[in-house]
Design a protein with these regions (language model features):
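Transmembrane beta-barrel domains of Gram-negative outer membranes and organellar outer membranes
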Residues: 1-200, 205-258
Length: 258
C-alpha cells in the first residue's frame, strides 16, 4: 500500500482476502516508509523528505454467511525518522541510484507541494489517528477453491489535516476482489482487487487534484506453515493530480514483500 504522504490522503484500500469469516476477528499491520522525492517544473515543485510510521488495527465482523463489515483505524507518525543512512548504504551496496540524497540533511522532515495558487508545507513531527475507513463486503461466488467478492467503503476525515494525518475530506470507494489457490495444489494463494475511488476535495492537494481514481492490486501468498506465510504484492493507482509533476500526475505502482 502506498504510504507516501500525499497518496495516503486518499482512500486506496489495502488488499485483503475475498473470504468472509463468521464472527468477530481483528488484525494489526504496521509499516515504516521512507520518503525522498525532489521534482521541479515550470509550474510547480514537489519535495518530500521524511519518514511515515503507520500502525493500523482492523476489526471485521462476518454475518449472514456471505457478508462482513470492517473498520480500520490507523495511527500515523510523520518525522525525520532513522532510515536515511540505512537506505543510502543499501543503494551504495547494490550500485542503485540514490537521487542525490547525499546533498540533503540526514533524517530530516520536510514536505512541500508548490503549485500556482497553492502552497503547502509541513516540517514539524506529528502523530495521531489518521482517517478511519469503514467498509462492507459481500462474497458473491465460491468456485473450485476460488472466491469472488464485492465491497464498498468510506474514508472519514478523522485525521488532522494540518498535520498531514488525513485529507480533511470524505472519500468513497467500490471494488471487486478475488482469492484462489494455485491449481496444482501448491500452498500458494492469489489475491487480486480492482476498484474506483470517488474522493472529496482536500485542501492539501489544491485545485488540480483528481477526484475520481482507479486502484488495483495483485498478491501471491505462500503458506509455508500453518501460522506463517510469505507475501509478494503489487499495488497500483491512478495519478493524484493533473499538475506538471511526474510523481503526482502519472499512475504509480509499488512492489512489496512481507
Amino acid at each position: 500500500l502506498n504510504q507516501s504522504p500525499l497518496a495516503a490522503l486518499r482512500a486506496l484500500p489495502a488488499q485483503r482476502s475475498a473470504d468472509v469469516e463468521a464472527g468477530l476477528s481483528w488484525s494489526i499491520a504496521g509499516s515504516i516508509s521512507n520518503h525522498f522525492t525532489v521534482q521541479e517544473s515550470d509550474s510547480g515543485s514537489l519535495f518530500l523528505d521524511g519518514q511515515s510510521d503507520v500502525l493500523s488495527v482492523a476489526f471485521r465482523y462476518g454475518f449472514l454467511e456471505n457478508w462482513d463489515v470492517e473498520v480500520t483505524v490507523p495511527w500515523r507518525h510523520h518525522s525525520g525518522g532513522f532510515t536515511d543512512k540505512l537506505i543510502t548504504d543499501w543503494h551504495k551496496l547494490f550500485s542503485l541510484p540514490n537521487a542525490d540524497r547525499d546533498l540533503y540533511p540526514v533524517d530530516d522532515l520536510h514536505y512541500r507541494l508548490s503549485l500556482p495558487g497553492h502552497q503547502k508545507k509541513f516540517d514539524e513531527p506529528a502523530f495521531g489517528i489518521g482517517d478511519v475507513q469503514i467498509s462492507m463486503n459481500r462474497r458473491l461466488l465460491v468456485i473450485d477453491g476460488g472466491q469472488l467478492s464485492v465491497g464498498a467503503g468510506a474514508k472519514t476525515p478523522t485525521g488532522k489535516a494540518a498535520d498531514w494525518l488525513g485529507s480533511g475530506a470524505t472519500d468513497y470507494y467500490a471494488l471487486m476482489r478475488f482469492t484462489g489457490q494455485q491449481l496444482n495444489g501448491w500452498p500458494v494463494y492469489w489475491h487480486g482487487q480492482l476498484g474506483t475511488t470517488f474522493a472529496g476535495r482536500s485542501e492539501l492537494l489544491g485545485e488540480t487534484q483528481k477526484r475520481t481514481l482507479w486502484f488495483a492490486g495483485l498478491a501471491a501468498e505462500w503458506m509455508f506453515s500453518p501460522r506463517w506465510s510469505a507475501l509478494f504484492q503489487y499495488d497500483a493507482h491512478s495519478a493524484l493530480l493533473s499538475a506538471d509533476l511526474a510523481a503526482l500526475s502519472r499512475p504509480t505502482g509499488m512492489l512489496s514483500m512481507a
